[in-house]
Curated annotation (Swiss-Prot):
Name listed for the protein in its UniProt record: Pre-rRNA-processing protein TSR1 homolog
Species of provenance: Drosophila melanogaster (Fruit fly)
A biological process term (GO) from this entry: endonucleolytic cleavage of tricistronic rRNA transcript (SSU-rRNA, 5.8S rRNA, LSU-rRNA)
Gene: Tsr1
Biased composition (Basic and acidic residues): 317-340, 431-442
GO MF, one annotated term: U3 snoRNA binding
Record InterPro entries: AARP2CN, Bms1/Tsr1, BMS1_TSR1_C, G_Bms1/Tsr1_dom
Biased composition (Acidic residues): 395-426
Keyword field: Nucleus, Phosphoprotein, Ribosome biogenesis
SMART domains: AARP2CN, DUF663
UniProt record similarity statement: Belongs to the TRAFAC class translation factor GTPase superfamily. Bms1-like GTPase family. TSR1 subfamily.
Cellular localisation: Nucleus, Nucleolus
Keyword Nucleus: yes
């Protein structure tokens, strides 16, 4: 093989200088990064343990088994031999449907079925075929009974919605059905089952089309529900099987607390006849969580009470009657300790010597007025500014107050704050409104024209006018006009001519930035804040209390028990019995702190069919969780941040946050807002949820002062009509200005003595532009909480005196 010659470089080979990229990456490194190449990495000695295929399969089977056992455990807690029966609410969606006829069909579904009726009207059905038992309740139907139906639905396990095919495809739900369905949707529907009745009464050829039309209507409201037929015994058996076998929907607001639907109720007066107190014995099946006998219970319509003991009588509705000999005696489950009972005190009693923020005395006011007359070096700071907020305001020369008046003596409330508070209590019972509106109708009839009318059309017009409330029409029109004005020019008000602006807006202040400027949540608090309770961390407390309620070992749910509710006023109980349409009562076990007053914040959304704007501080009936009460809430924007802008009106299709004083309640809790109609019925105007119980939520009311450019010279302009006194211009000089076109500026100096001022902006002003000054003050709700309880004569006298004290306090504040 021939030898091959290879080139060998000599010592004089050219060596090019290496390219140095410096601090930036080279083109090659950038190219490698874009291609996704990864550099070399040291091998870690900690290898992750990779599961084999069999191990992964076993893990999935274990998780599936745990979930299945959890579901079965939830099912075993209801309807069995030693558990509470399925509580089913029969709710017609049409006023013409008789729920008792549907109940008779259900009673005939099986030959071995056992039916028993309780003294309060609950129908117990034991079905040995399924080894299950059921309890059926039927709330009253018709306009005015919505609240009773909502109370029943709060504690039921299943809702059996009854519809009919006898009135055609368009009458699956009538007006009553639509109204109650909207309310129960806002509150939360327990596991729904829809049954179609009277399908056998129509032509057999039209039955499939009628059922399909009904299914189409139901699918829009309840997409996951399939309509069932309820006309025969076999169909009733299918409905019972569906109720007992379907997965139950959990309403956490009720599931987090113990509750009892009263089966037998008995009131026993106390030993002292002059005391007017007695013991209320409520018997029924305990549901939800374990009951703490040392805690408080709430009965809607009666109030909050303490328990003395809990006993377990024999269960009269057992599935297997052959075991009646077992546990035939009354057993004492738990007895409360008087030293450990939760106190019924709902308000904090402030100590006047504990440095609480209270109204100053006359001596303090006189001393303050004498001090302000002295010559001193001051800063002109809007009232309410703290030291760190006023640090950027420049010092001014010495001034002397010629009048010697304190700014606090002047009223600062806007025109919309000078409205008269409605001192009349509006109860949730429709009968309480009849006297007021009958009197109004009688007054209206006195002014009716008594001249005989010949034509029939004129007679109809006269009848129509007699049924109309002209005062309510005028008030609604005025409210609509004010809401429209506030929507077009939000928060804009005219500077008064006769009162200096520095006195009119003495409690307002300017903010550098609404989002970032600080505002102390503890300054200038009202006296009512000394009466409430506050948590250091509400969310943390909520989690702790809910976890403790689940782990508490008290009276276990599912037992047939008797609660001894002590210190119930006999007069209130008699009034409650006379006002109730049904013999059932509901008892809720309250969590710790849920009877103490606080500032409650709820998120509300207007209902689609409610179009009249709601004014802030207008009276509403609020149902929050298991409570129902009357308050005058204030509204604010539902936004992130530590400050929230006050809303004068709650307009249709909007979402706001309502703030008011109410007892503490831990979320989740649905919220329903009702307004009283002129015919004394209730209309659902908003729905929402409980946000928090936090008094530190800062709600700022904004006023906008507007001025118009008189002369414009590039970035400077002369503004007029914002103020009418030279002193006002100097007082508000530190506050920034904003224009409608987005310019920012500030006041340079005053021009003349009539409020004209020279201002500088960050750009050229347009002749059609308008200068604005934003001022803010913190607003608080008024203490108008009134729980919806039955009223006795003594309570009416106490309420009247409380209203007089409240009106005197409001007059002093204004």
């Amino acid at each position: 093989m021939a030898d091959h010659a290879f080139h060998r470089p000599g010592p004089l080979k050219q060596a090019n200088k290496a390219h140095k990229t410096g601090r930036h990456r080279s083109k090659g490194a950038i190219d490698n990064a874009q291609k996704g190449k990864i550099g070399l990495r040291p091998i870690s000695h900690k290898h992750k343990q990779q599961q084999r295929k069999e191990q992964r399969r076993n893990q999935m089977n274990q998780l599936r088994k745990n979930k299945r056992e959890e579901v079965l455990e939830q099912k075993r807690k209801l309807g069995g031999q030693n558990t509470a029966p399925f509580l089913v609410c029969l709710l017609p969606m049409h006023e013409q449907i008789d729920p008792m006829s549907a109940l008779e069909i259900l009673k005939s579904c099986d030959s071995e079925l056992v039916v028993e009726n309780s003294p309060s009207g609950i129908v117990y059905i034991n079905l040995p075929r399924f080894k299950q038992r059921f309890a059926f309740v039927t709330p009253p139907v018709g306009r005015g009974n919505e609240l009773i139906a909502l109370d029943y639905l709060k504690v039921c396990d299943t809702t059996l919605l009854l519809t009919t095919a006898a009135f055609g495809d368009d009458e699956i739900f009538d007006r009553w059905g639509q109204r109650i369905f909207n309310m129960m949707s806002a509150q939360g529907i327990p596991t729904p089952v829809v049954a179609l009745m009277d399908l056998e009464s129509i032509n057999p050829k039209r039955r499939p089309a009628a059922k399909q039309a009904a299914q189409k209507v139901i699918s829009k409201l309840l997409p996951e529900e399939k309509i069932m037929q309820l006309d025969t015994a076999s169909e009733a058996l299918n409905v019972m099987r569906r109720i007992g076998g379907q997965k139950k929907r959990i309403l956490h607001n009720v599931a987090n607390r113990p509750h009892l639907f009263g089966d037998v109720v008995e009131f026993k007066p106390g030993s002292d006849p002059s005391d007017d107190l007695g013991t209320l014995e409520v018997t029924g099946f305990l549901r939800g969580q374990s009951l703490n006998v040392n805690g408080l219970v709430h009965i809607p319509g009666l109030g909050d009470f303490q328990l003395s003991q809990v006993v377990a009588p024999p269960d009269p509705y057992k599935l297997d009657k052959s075991r009646d000999g077992e546990n035939s005696e009354v057993r004492l489950l738990d007895r409360s300790d008087p030293s450990k009972r939760t106190s019924l005190q709902s308000e904090n009693i402030p100590d006047p010597m504990d440095a609480e923020q209270t109204w100053p005395t006359e001596d303090e006011i006189a001393a303050s007025q004498a001090e302000t007359k002295k010559m001193k070096l001051v800063k002109r700071v809007p009232k309410g500014y703290s030291e760190y907020q006023a640090a950027w305001i420049p010092d001014v020369e010495e001034v002397e107050d010629p009048d010697g008046k304190d700014d606090d003596d002047m009223s600062e409330d806007d025109d919309d704050d000078k409205e008269d508070d409605n001192e009349d209590f509006m109860s949730c019972d429709n009968k309480s409104f009849e006297d007021e509106y009958e009197k109004r109708d009688s007054d209206t009839e006195e002014f009716q024209d008594t001249v005989s009318v010949a034509s029939e059309a004129a007679i109809n017009d006269e009848k129509y006018d007699q049924q109309m409330d002209f005062q309510e029409e005028r008030e609604t029109l005025k409210k609509l006009q004010q809401a429209r004005t506030d929507q077009l020019w939000p928060d804009e008000i005219d500077t008064p001519l006769d009162v200096p602006a520095r006195e009119r807006f003495q409690k307002y202040r300017g903010l550098e930035s609404f989002r970032t400027s600080p505002w102390d949540a503890k300054e200038n608090l009202p006296a009512d804040y000394a009466r409430i309770y506050q948590f250091q961390n509400f969310d943390r407390t909520k989690r702790r209390i809910l976890n403790e309620a689940k782990e508490f070992e008290g009276v276990l749910p599912g037992l047939y028990v008797t609660l001894y509710v002590i210190n119930v006023p006999e007069s209130r109980w008699n009034a409650f019995k006379s006002a109730q349409l049904m013999d059932n009562i509901i008892v809720y076990g309250m969590l710790p702190h849920e009877h103490q007053m606080c500032v409650m914040n709820v998120v509300l959304q207007r209902m689609p069919d409610s179009e009249v704007p709601l004014k802030s501080k207008e009276q509403l009936i609020i149902q929050c969780g298991y409570r129902r009460f009357v308050v005058n809430p204030i509204y604010s924007q539902h936004t992130n941040g530590d400050k929230h802008k006050f809303e004068r009106y709650f307009r249709p299709y909007e979402t706001v946050c309502a703030t008011f004083y109410a007892p503490i309640q831990f979320p989740p809790a649905p919220v329903l807002a009702f307004k009283v109609n002129p015919d004394s019925t209730l209309a659902l105007v908003a729905r929402g949820r409980l946000l928090s119980c936090n008094p530190d939520r800062i709600v700022l009311k904004r006023v906008v002062l507007s001025g118009h450019p008189m002369r414009i010279n590039r970035k400077s302009a002369s503004i007029r009509y914002m103020f009418f006194y030279k002193e006002d211009v100097e007082y508000f000089k530190p506050v920034k200005l904003r224009t409608k076109c987005g310019r920012l500026g500030h006041i340079k100096e005053s021009l003349g003595t009539h409020g004209h001022m020279k201002c500088y902006f960050d750009g050229q002003l347009r002749s059609y532009d308008t200068a604005f000054m934003y001022l803010y003050k913190r607003v608080f709700p008024k203490w108008t909480y009134e729980e919806c309880l039955v009223r006795t004569a003594e309570h009416e006298r106490q309420h009247a005196s409380a209203n007089r004290r409240s009106s005197q306090q409001v007059a002093m504040e204004e």
